[in-house]
Amino acid sequence: MSGAFGAMNPAAAPLVWEVGALCRAVSDALQARFNPVAVRGEISGFSRAASGHCYFSIKDAGGQIRCAMFRRAAQLMDFSPRDGELVELRGRLGVYEQRGDLQLVVESMQRAGQGALFEQFLRLKARLEAEGLFDAARKRSLPPLPRGIGVVTSPGAAALHDVITALRRRVPHIPVVLVPALVQGVQAPASLIDALQRLYGLAREGAGSVDGSVAGAPPIDTILLVRGGGSIEDLWAFNDERLARTIVQSPVPLISGVGHETDFTIADFCADLRAPTPTAAAELVSQPREVWMGALQLMQGRLEDGVQRLLDRQQQRLDLAAQRLGRPSEQLARSRLQLSRQAQRLRHAMQLRLQRMDHAGQGLQAQLPAGMRRGLDRRADHLARMELRLQLLDPRLVLQRGYALLTDAEGHPVTEARSAPPGTALQAQLADGSLDLVVTQPRLL
């Protein structure tokens, strides 16, 4: 037995690691080698915890990495991430020791390629705004009852189906003219401009005719420029400067309905009205048929009542004129007497009214200061009580006395020492900030 042990070479034995220590060593090595790190890929399994922290994976065809984005970094995002979206991340690479997983702690996130495109978008927006293309004074109101609606979009897009469905449901009697155009790609701006110019021609020709129509085409007095949602690259055609200048030349009100509610393009700022979606654009220009029928019936009733009242007044005047022609001298004497009595009553009423107003003003002048003081005193007392209650309920007072609020990596409060084994990552919220902690040895009471 002793010989067997003697055959072993202690010097050649490998270092035996504790699991947590090995995880920390690997994490330190990764941070020293790769941090800071930037990575591009698709979002997968995105979720936002009640604490505000975000957890997801970033992946491509070659692999995936688990990611954690804490609340402070998540609050700086200007968009809502979705699964399958291509993004660029920047952060610190390490190991989540509790699971031994490779993890990227994300410090910033943006859509892939968005940085340069967004800067280009902001520069163009600022220049066109300085030229006055976005001024509210040039925005026009929509016609209350359009005679014809022009639509510019892709003929195979879901946006067209949404628009046509909404218009047929709400205003099936209004004709719609579709001018197809490309809505994505390098050729899309020129295609959109050509489609708009064709509708502008129809609108101008219709404005010069008696009924607003052109031979073979209905009148056009409203235009919808629509497209479904997509990435900033997908919607980039609607940020074209030539398209923006074409939009502001529209002879009739133009509504843009590009993307989703959170998407904004240069076309939105140039249009007379911006709708959050293509369906909303159609609804803005189309009051339901029931609303217009009700309005027409109401106007018809008012017109009939007005005509009847006019006829009644004229008949009454005719009757009175006939009576006066019978005895004009007696009627004149009665009118003079009646006028004299009315003038006397009016003078007397005015004197009484002025006297009452004078007495009332004197009374109010005496009562107003005292009433105001009492009201101000009551409000000041109520405000002081509310301020004291707020101060007593302020959790920061507890933190300022040296206490701290501990949360785990998931943002859940830690209230028991046994729930935080060695190596657990915690965050301590203090009165003036927070600390990231790692448990070395819990001590139970």
Curated annotation (Swiss-Prot):
GO terms for cellular component: cytoplasm; exodeoxyribonuclease VII complex. GO terms for biological process: DNA catabolic process. Disulfide bonds: none annotated. InterPro entries: Exonuc_VII_L (IPR003753), Exonuc_VII_lsu_C (IPR020579), OB-fold_nuc-bd_dom (IPR025824). Its main location: cytoplasm. Keywords: Cytoplasm, Exonuclease, Hydrolase, Nuclease. It is found in: Cytoplasm. CDD domains: ExoVII_LU_OBF. It catalyses: Exonucleolytic cleavage in either 5'- to 3'- or 3'- to 5'-direction to yield nucleoside 5'-phosphates. Pfam families: Exonuc_VII_L (PF02601), tRNA_anti_2 (PF13742). Its EC number is 3.1.11.6. It comes from the Bacteria. Heterooligomer composed of large and small subunits. Bidirectionally degrades single-stranded DNA into large acid-insoluble oligonucleotides, which are then degraded further into small acid-soluble oligonucleotides. Belongs to the XseA family. This is Exodeoxyribonuclease 7 large subunit. It comes from Delftia acidovorans (strain DSM 14801 / SPH-1).
